[in-house]
């Protein structure tokens, strides 16, 4: 029997559950698979299967994450759930499991708690585009006024971190009721209502191939009689033979024209997101281009040296530093394909950063790098990863 071809007829979207410990993230994840399985859009995955999340390595950091997939009538979803708070922090900062949107789970019995706040802040810092809220454990709250208060608190918290708190859908329900079939309205119906809102409210992500062209430079060769070939994996967009592109980062931006695209020694008329290609550049000398620069659509990305970042610093056990660092710390920042030295400025009131901390900090690089918000990087000391980060905003 031939293996069934995976046909993706529906648009794909990556989401995840976030929120305070024990507010019901994993139960909700299980409940979604159970309810959608009845409609044939998922395989039911029980709580304990999701809870024993396998460990993965992302940028040298060990993270436990569980992945489930399911579909609604409109979309195919990959859903990520993490067992521990530290795993969420690492996951969101490294972008190990990318999120196009998040389901914030808040227990109606407790209201927003410290990690609720921290996950919303992280979602803002790492650029999660949209959040839908599931007010869980509503079967434990008899007073409708109390529910309204919790809802108001959640909306205020979201607004505080620049999410549209007054517009975000909040669905009241109970993941346990859905799993135990005890209360149709708070259980199954609430989960279906949640997924309807996730479908409608979380915007469909733009596919990498539809975004402006960008390719990090991995290697540069000179081919006699042909010119200079730059190799790398196209990160996004499409590049066609004959198109004008820019070389951005490290040195002043240069314009050039792509006169050929090669893949596996064959000449193509274009290269697109995901392809490993060699691009032949007109009139560009071998010494004009270096690893760490990017080829991109003119005007789409600018070089920057100063930015604000959210970073996670590895523990000693993860192979990180054994000691704290202070402001003016000078490690290397590994962006895409190269290390650049930078100086760290800690926020006022933060004396030092301990291994295992996550921190908002300002970085000044010694040379400019092609960057934009949401770009991930590693923090390294002599080739050893000591942290991971994401560009939260650009200063200059």
Swiss-Prot record:
PROSITE patterns the UniProt entry points to: G_TR_1, G_TR_2
CDD domains named among the record's database cross-references: EF_Tu (cd01884), EFTU_II (cd03697), EFTU_III (cd03707)
Region annotation G4: residue ranges? 136-139
Q: Per the record, what are the reactions this protein catalyses?
A: GTP + H2O = GDP + phosphate + H(+)
Predominantly, its location class is: cytoplasm
Name the SUPFAM superfamilies for this protein.
Answer: EF-Tu/eEF-1alpha/eIF2-gamma C-terminal domain, P-loop containing nucleoside triphosphate hydrolases, Translation proteins
Write down the superkingdom of origin.
Bacteria
This entry's Gene Ontology molecular function terms read:
GTP binding; GTPase activity; guanosine tetraphosphate binding; translation elongation factor activity
A cellular component term, taken from the record's GO annotations: cytosol
Report keywords, A-Z: Cytoplasm, Elongation factor, GTP-binding, Hydrolase, Magnesium, Metal-binding, Nucleotide-binding, Protein biosynthesis
**Binding residues for GTP, per the UniProt record?**
19-26, 81-85, 136-139
Q: Where is this region: G3?
A: 81-84
What segment(s) does the record annotate as region G1?
19-26
Q: Where is the tr-type G domain?
A: 10-206
Q: Gene3D superfamilies under this entry?
A: P-loop containing nucleotide triphosphate hydrolases (3.40.50.300), Translation factors (2.40.30.10)
Where is the region G5?
174-176
Stretch list, region G2: 60-64
Q: Where, per UniProt, does this protein localize?
A: Cytoplasm
The EC designation for this entry is 3.6.5.3
* Positions contributing to Mg(2+) binding: 26
Function description:
GTP hydrolase that promotes the GTP-dependent binding of aminoacyl-tRNA to the A-site of ribosomes during protein biosynthesis.
Q: Which family does it belong to?
A: Belongs to the TRAFAC class translation factor GTPase superfamily. Classic translation factor GTPase family. EF-Tu/EF-1A subfamily.
On subunit structure and binding partners, the annotation says: Monomer.
Q: Would you tell me the protein name for this molecule?
A: Elongation factor Tu
Please tell me the species this chain comes from. Afipia carboxidovorans (strain ATCC 49405 / DSM 1227 / KCTC 32145 / OM5) (Oligotropha carboxidovorans)
């Amino acid at each position: 029997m031939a293996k069934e071809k995976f046909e993706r007829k529906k648009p794909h979207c990556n989401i995840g559950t976030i929120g305070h410990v024990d507010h019901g993230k994993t139960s909700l994840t299980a409940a979604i698979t159970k309810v959608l399985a009845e409609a044939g859009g998922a395989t039911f995955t029980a709580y304990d299967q999701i809870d024993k999340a396998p460990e993965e390595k992302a940028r040298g950091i060990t993270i436990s994450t569980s992945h489930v997939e399911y579909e609604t009538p409109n979309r195919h979803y990959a859903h990520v759930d993490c067992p521990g708070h530290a795993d969420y922090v690492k996951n969101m900062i490294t972008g190990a499991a990318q999120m196009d949107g998040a389901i914030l789970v808040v227990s109606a019995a407790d209201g927003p708690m410290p990690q609720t706040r921290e996950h919303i802040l992280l979602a803002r810092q790492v650029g999660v585009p949209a959040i839908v809220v599931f007010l869980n454990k509503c079967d434990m709250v008899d007073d409708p006024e109390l529910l309204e208060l919790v809802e108001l608190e959640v909306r205020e918290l979201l607004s505080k971190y620049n999410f549209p708190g007054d517009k975000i859908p909040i669905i009241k329900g109970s993941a346990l009721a859905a799993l135990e079939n005890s209360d149709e309205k708070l259980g199954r119906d609430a989960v279906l209502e949640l997924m309807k809102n996730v479908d409608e409210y979380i915007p469909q992500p733009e596919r990498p191939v539809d975004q402006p062209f960008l390719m990090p430079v991995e290697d540069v060769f000179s081919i006699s009689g042909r010119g200079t070939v730059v190799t790398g994996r196209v990160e996004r967009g499409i590049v066609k033979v004959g198109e004008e592109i820019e070389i951005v980062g490290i040195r002043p931006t240069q314009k050039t024209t792509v006169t050929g695209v090669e893949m596996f020694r064959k000449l193509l008329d274009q290269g697109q997101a995901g392809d490993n290609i060699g691009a032949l550049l007109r009139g560009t000398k071998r010494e004009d281009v270096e690893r760490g620069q990017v080829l991109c659509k003119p005007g789409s990305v600018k070089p920057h040296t100063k930015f604000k970042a959210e970073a996670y610093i590895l523990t000693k056990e993860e192979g990180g530093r054994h000691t704290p660092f202070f402001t003016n710390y000078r490690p290397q920042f590994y962006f895409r394909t190269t290390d650049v030295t930078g100086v760290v400025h800690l926020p006022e009131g933060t004396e030092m950063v301990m291994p295992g901390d996550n921190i908002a900090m300002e970085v000044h690089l010694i040379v400019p790098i092609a960057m934009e918000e949401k770009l991930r990087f590693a923090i390294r000391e002599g080739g050893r990863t000591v942290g991971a980060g994401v560009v939260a905003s650009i200063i200059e």
